[in-house]
């Protein structure tokens, strides 16, 4: 799943987005 913290999208997996400093699942 995508809920690690982030400052930018590159810190998240490719199927996630960085929003409000957390990685979130996106389709």
Swiss-Prot record:
Expression by tissue: Expressed by the venom duct.
Cellular localisation: Secreted
UniProt name for this protein: Conotoxin
Organism: Conus amadis (Amadis cone)
Positions carrying Asparagine amide: 27
Single Gene Ontology MF annotation: toxin activity
Family: Belongs to the conotoxin P superfamily.
Main function: Probable neurotoxin that inhibits ion channels.
Extent of the signal sequence: none
The UniProt record lists the keyword Transmembrane helix: no
CC annotations in GO: extracellular region
Domain comment, as recorded: The cysteine framework is IX (C-C-C-C-C-C).
Alphabetically ordered keywords of this record: Amidation, Disulfide bond, Ion channel impairing toxin, Neurotoxin, Secreted, Toxin
Main localization of the protein described in the UniProt heading: secreted
Disulphide-bridged cysteine pairs: 2-16, 6-18, 12-23
